[in-house]
Structures are given as structure tokens and as C-alpha cells.
Amino acid sequence: MKTFVAKPETVKREWYVVDAADKTLGRLATEIASRLRGKHKPEYTPHVDTGDYIVVINAEKVVVTGNKAKGKMYYSHTGYPGGLKETNFEKLQAFKPEMIIEKAVKGMLPKGPLGRDMFRKMKVFAGPEHKHAAQQPQVLDI
């Protein structure tokens, strides 16, 4: 019996919607990253994007444990000398809650072109409404 290798043109992708309300950030991000990679499928192949599409709603209601709301820092750089900017979880959640989940999941995906393709299949929305109803996503309980 030969080893099965998935081919990009034969991969069947599903759409799922995940409600992030009152979910722990890390536990949510690991499950999303695993689904984006396709590791839950029997035809998973490391060098082929076999993952599904994930729509995350209620990103503004995701939680972290302990004192991380004030202590967890996010850094960005403008590209200019002295341009290191930092903000904590609380401020970023108030300003741009989608970025929290995006940054957590992106760090768990492979680096390079394949990882970028996987990351593009995730759509994050701050509130309960999303614009992908036409794809008829199934509810994924995490």
C-alpha cells in the first residue's frame, strides 16, 4: 500500500464559525491553528495546505488568565530609530480586538509562503456579525 499524499487541487475545504466569547486566548488559538493547517483531517500532508476556513466572531470578548490583561505586552516597530511601540492586552482589546487573535494564531502557523496561505483562510470579526453567511459556515464548538 502506498502512502497517500494530498494534492492542492483535490483538497475539500469546509467553512466553520467560532465564537470567541469568554474563551481563553491560547486554547482558542491552538485549536484554530490546528484547523487552519488541516491536522484534524486524515489526509493531512505537511507540505500541502489541507486546512479549512475559520471565521472568528466576538473577538472583543476573548479572555486571558491571571494578570496578563495588564502584563501581556504587544510590540510593533515603525521602522525608524526609536520607533518601538508597545501596548498591553487591555488597550489592544479596546482599540483593535481582531489583532489579538490574529497575532496569537499567526505565531502558531508555519513561517513562509505556506503559512501565509493558511493564515489568509482565517477571518476575524470583533462583534457577533460576520460577512461570510453566503458560505454557510458550520458552528465549531471549541
UniProtKB/Swiss-Prot annotation:
SUPFAM superfamilies attached to this UniProt entry: Ribosomal protein L13
Matching InterPro entries: Ribosomal_uL13, Ribosomal_uL13_bac-type, Ribosomal_uL13_CS, Ribosomal_uL13_sf
UniProt keyword Ribonucleoprotein, yes or no: yes
Single GO BP term: translation
Gene3D superfamilies per the UniProt record, alphabetical: Ribosomal protein L13 (3.90.1180.10)
Pfam families for this protein: Ribosomal_L13 (PF00572)
Keywords carried by this UniProt record: Ribonucleoprotein, Ribosomal protein
CDD domains on file: Ribosomal_L13
TM regions (residue ranges): none
Highest taxon of source: Bacteria
GO cellular component: cytosolic large ribosomal subunit
Family: Belongs to the universal ribosomal protein uL13 family.
Protein purpose: This protein is one of the early assembly proteins of the 50S ribosomal subunit, although it is not seen to bind rRNA by itself. It is important during the early stages of 50S assembly.
HAMAP family on file: Ribosomal_uL13
UniProt subunit comment: Part of the 50S ribosomal subunit.
UniProt-recorded name of the protein: Large ribosomal subunit protein uL13
